[in-house]
UniProtKB/Swiss-Prot annotation:
Active site (UniProt): C301 (thioimidate intermediate), R397 (proton acceptor)
Name listed for the protein in its UniProt record: Inosine-5'-monophosphate dehydrogenase
NCBIfam families assigned: IMP_dehydrog
Family stated for the protein in its record: Belongs to the IMPDH/GMPR family.
GO terms, molecular function: IMP dehydrogenase activity; metal ion binding; nucleotide binding
Organism: Pyrococcus horikoshii (strain ATCC 700860 / DSM 12428 / JCM 9974 / NBRC 100139 / OT-3)
Length: 486
């Protein structure tokens, strides 16, 4: 028998989410009692096992803030300049600080037009007015309304209440409520401005009790980099990013690995590398804290069709997880998740968390443009291997940067739209609810037990059809089971 026939006979069988179900077990566990927190690196623990994808129609700072507030993690995409990505990370970090230290200020002799420019640029509604390092006023968008051309000192509020650095949350909140103010400048013993407390930050800290924060009380955030862009990684690290995610279509590229090892030595942030689908890759990526699994499972990815390469996602996750366990690495399943049940399956197959693109691309916080088609709202969504994303700068992810002409790109993704799905909070509520339900059926009190107790059954095509609603015309669409198929 020839070696090529032997290749086929030795080929393993690959399974994806629709090919398997989890077998229900005897249990005393109820969904409301399960713990869905997970660790994705030695220093980063999430309260829900979900990350948003590093895609230019999925994650920018608004998505990252929303994800962290719900207990997950946003990975800001790299299809932008270094300075812009650094600023996006800083925006997330500023979103809920008790005391904002790097305060944007303005001088009293500046124009209100410049004040408005600063507010728009930094996504804020007001500015302390500072002269000789002392606070002399506060100016807000409300003060400026329709008063272009005037000076800040003409419109600012001059009677400013300040507080010391030792202020506690409850005391700051009480002062702001009693005085009906939205901002409290923080000063040192010499009266020098050292920070700012805002009402929106205090309210957010109380509202989002499941949020994930660092030791300074700031929201967690991750950012993507090319395996060769060491300068970007260093700048993001300086900006306080919690996790660097090396974002490439094929992380088992030996040139990329050499560069990633050098990068790892130059940053303090935790380090995730992806994507891979072969357990052998783990042996060469042990310098990472976690690996990201998925070659071509995404709804907008054409790698498997264009390149003929990939491993069905459940099998890929299981193979990589077995090897990663030997080195103490964490595993993130990236791509192919369509329903909450797929999250349950991915974790039972060995993942510590999942990364979502499609399911979050239709949310309010996603940066994709809204479009109306036949009276229904959609949001644009594209793969980072699509022609549009490559032209914007994402070609390097597929090792097509630099030497390729635009007209000669070989795309590995498509561009399209997905239905508008509401807010990130609403979508995650349904997804986490489904995860908890699955854990209840399996008898898993936490993510670790789901990995240990989850037992799979392989199903046929008829079994897949039986699993979905059938023999009925659905008249009321469920929030976790969309009727619109693409």
């Amino acid at each position: 028998m020839g070696k090529f026939v032997e290749k086929l006979e030795k080929a393993i069988k690959g399974y994806t989410f629709d090919d398997v179900l989890l077998i229900p077990q005897a249990t005393e566990v109820e969904p409301k009692d399960v713990d869905v927190s997970t660790r994705i690196t030695p220093n980063v623990k999430l309260n829900i096992p979900i990350l948003s994808a590093a895609m230019d129609t999925v994650t920018e700072w608004e998505m990252a803030v929303a994800m962290a507030r719900e207990g997950g993690l946003g990975v800001i995409h790299r299809n932008m300049g270094i300075e812009e990505q650094v600023e996006q990370v800083k925006r997330v970090k500023r979103a809920e600080r008790l005391i904002v230290e790097d305060v944007i200020t303005i001088a009293p002799d500046e124009t209100v037009d410049f004040a408005l420019f600063l507010m728009e640029k930094h996504g804020i509604d007001g500015l302390p007015v500072v002269e000789d390092e002392k606070v002399v006023g506060i100016i807000t968008k409300k003060d400026i309304a329709a008063r272009e051309g005037k000076l800040v000192k003409e419109l600012m509020t001059k009677e400013v209440i300040t507080v010391p650095e030792s202020i506690e949350v409850e005391e700051a909140l009480k002062i702001m409520i009693e005085n009906r103010i939205d901002r409290l400048p923080v000063v040192d013993e010499r009266g020098k401005l050292v920070g700012l407390i805002t009402m929106s930050d205090l309210v957010a800290r109380k509202k989002y009790k499941n949020a994930v924060r660092d030791e300074n009380g700031e929201l967690l955030v991750a950012a993507a980099v090319s395996p060769f862009d060491i300068k970007r990684a260093i700048e993001l690290d300086k900006a306080g990013v919690d996790v660097i995610v090396v974002d490439t279509a094929h992380a088992h590229n030996l040139k990329a690995i050499k560069s990633m090892k050098e990068m790892r030595q130059k940053v303090d942030a935790d380090f995730i590398v992806g994507n891979i689908a072969n357990p052998k890759a783990v042996d060469d990526l042990t310098f990472a804290d976690a690996v990201k699994v998925g070659i071509g499972p995404g709804s907008i990815c054409t790698t498997r069709i264009v390149a003929g390469v990939g491993v069905p996602q459940i099998t890929a996750v299981a193979m990589v997880a077995d090897r990663a366990q030997e080195y103490g690495l964490y595993v993130i399943a990236d791509g192919g998740i369509r329903y909450s049940g797929d999250i349950v399956k991915a974790i039972a197959a060995g993942a510590d968390a999942v990364m979502l693109g499609n399911l979050l691309a239709g949310t309010k916080e996603a940066p994709g443009k809204e479009v109306i088609i036949n009276g229904r709202k959609y949001k644009q969504y594209r793969g980072m291997g699509s022609l549009g994303a490559m032209m914007k700068g994402g070609a390097e992810r597929y090792y097509q940067g630099g030497y390729m002409k635009t007209r000669k790109f070989v795309p590995e993704g498509v561009e399209g739209v997905v239905p508008y799905r509401g807010t990130v909070s609403e979508v995650l509520y349904q997804l986490v609810g489904g995860l908890k339900a699955g854990m209840g059926y399996v008898g898993a009190r936490n993510i670790r037990e789901l990995k240990e107790k989850g037992e799979f059954v392989i199903i046929t095509h008829a079994g897949i059809k039986e699993s979905h609603p059938h023999d009925i015309i659905i008249t009321n669409e469920a929030p976790n089971y969309p009727l619109e198929k693409f």
